[in-house]
């Protein structure tokens, strides 16, 4: 019996390049990906095929699908409705496929709230100017619709922290490399490759042992000094500052490179060392508890 697949949300502002990235991901058979064909009330663009790119339906048909609970999610966007057919997704998951949901942020929020077995990835544009350029490059939108899409993007981008991963789409090649590694790390593939995260952890361990032993010793000493009750003292005695530092730095270097970096450098020692130097200023060495991430920089 095949293992059940996973729902993989790849979401982000309109025009960020979801279709181009997904198209490239689908060429890698080891990823076991199946594209979920969405239902929409909008008119087909040139070259789009019904049942392949979208299920193009009337507003009445879409409304009936909502009433009959036939959609996993649905959303209205710039005058049109979009939704994900439940039956199609469930059939593919039971076949062992990982189903890509290429959906708008409103729809992704519904799935994250209501469904299980979901991996979520937010695709980010490098800049708003680049996003505008990509939308205009389609040559399918009026100026008013372009403005509406950009206005919506400004409201959607702050929601990126609700997703498991944030990936910048500065180029399709770089974004695909990042997402492929995420899927390997999350054990969604049949590939024998190991995630680059595993090698990253080894690099971080070496750098920490070479440069930050003094910091680790002082961190542990500070935590013990500030422990004022029995529970806090036990926690301080059990605290492994070296292990915690390696975990924080590895996760943050990986996260930051996915969001704003060249993924080909993720296992480059000089690159990792540079990232760690900046992160070390943000470690609170008077406390075991750290910020959940170092966003905002």
From Swiss-Prot:
InterPro entries, per the entry: GK/Ca_channel_bsu, Guanylate_kin-like_dom, Guanylate_kinase, Guanylate_kinase_CS, P-loop_NTPase
Domain Guanylate kinase-like: start-end pairs: 5-184
Keyword Kinase: yes
Source superkingdom: Bacteria
The protein's enzyme class: transferase
Entry keyword set: ATP-binding, Cytoplasm, Kinase, Nucleotide-binding, Transferase
GO molecular function term, any single one: ATP binding
EC number, as in UniProt: 2.7.4.8
GO CC annotation: cytosol
Pfam families documented for this protein: Guanylate_kin
Keyword field contains Ubl conjugation: no
Binding residue positions for ATP: 12-19
Localization per Swiss-Prot or TrEMBL: Cytoplasm
Known catalytic reactions: GMP + ATP = GDP + ADP
Classification via Gene3D superfamilies: Guanylate Kinase phosphate binding domain (3.30.63.10), P-loop containing nucleotide triphosphate hydrolases (3.40.50.300)
Chain positions covered by the region annotation Unknown: 205-297
Protein family membership: Belongs to the guanylate kinase family.
Function: Essential for recycling GMP and indirectly, cGMP.
PANTHER family named in the record: GUANYLATE KINASE, GUANYLATE KINASE-RELATED
This protein's name: Guanylate kinase
Organism of this sequence: Mesoplasma florum (strain ATCC 33453 / NBRC 100688 / NCTC 11704 / L1)
């Amino acid at each position: 019996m095949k293992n059940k697949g996973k729902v993989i949300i790849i979401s982000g502002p309109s025009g960020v390049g979801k279709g181009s990235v997904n198209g490239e991901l689908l060429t890698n058979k080891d990823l076991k990906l199946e594209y979920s064909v969405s239902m929409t009330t909008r008119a087909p663009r040139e070259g789009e095929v019904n049942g392949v790119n979208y299920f193009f339906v009337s507003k009445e048909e879409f409304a009936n699908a909502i009433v009959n609970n036939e959609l996993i999610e649905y959303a209205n966007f710039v005058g049109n409705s979009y939704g994900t057919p439940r039956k199609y997704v469930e059939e593919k998951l039971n076949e062992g496929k990982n189903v890509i949901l290429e959906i708008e942020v409103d729809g992704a929020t519904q799935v994250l709230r209501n469904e299980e077995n979901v991996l979520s990835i937010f695709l980010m544009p490098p800049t708003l100017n680049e996003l505008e350029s990509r939308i205009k490059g389609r040559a399918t939108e009026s100026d008013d619709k372009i403005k509406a899409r950009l206005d919506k993007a400004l409201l959607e981008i702050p929601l990126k922290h609700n997703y498991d991963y944030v990936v910048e789409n500065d180029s399709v090649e770089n974004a695909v490399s990042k997402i492929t590694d995420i899927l390997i790390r999350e054990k969604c593939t049949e590939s024998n490759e190991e995630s680059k995260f595993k090698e990253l952890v080894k690099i971080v361990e070496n750098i920490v042992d070479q440069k930050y032993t003094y910091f680790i010793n002082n961190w542990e000493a500070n935590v013990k000094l500030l422990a004022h009750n029995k529970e806090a003292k036990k926690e301080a005695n059990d605290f492994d500052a070296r292990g915690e530092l390696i975990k924080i730095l590895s996760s943050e270097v990986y996260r930051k490179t996915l969001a704003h970096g060249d993924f080909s450098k993720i296992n480059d020692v000089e690159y990792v060392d540079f990232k760690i130097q900046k992160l070390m200023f943000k470690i609170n060495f008077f406390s075991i508890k750290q910020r959940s991430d170092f966003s905002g920089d």
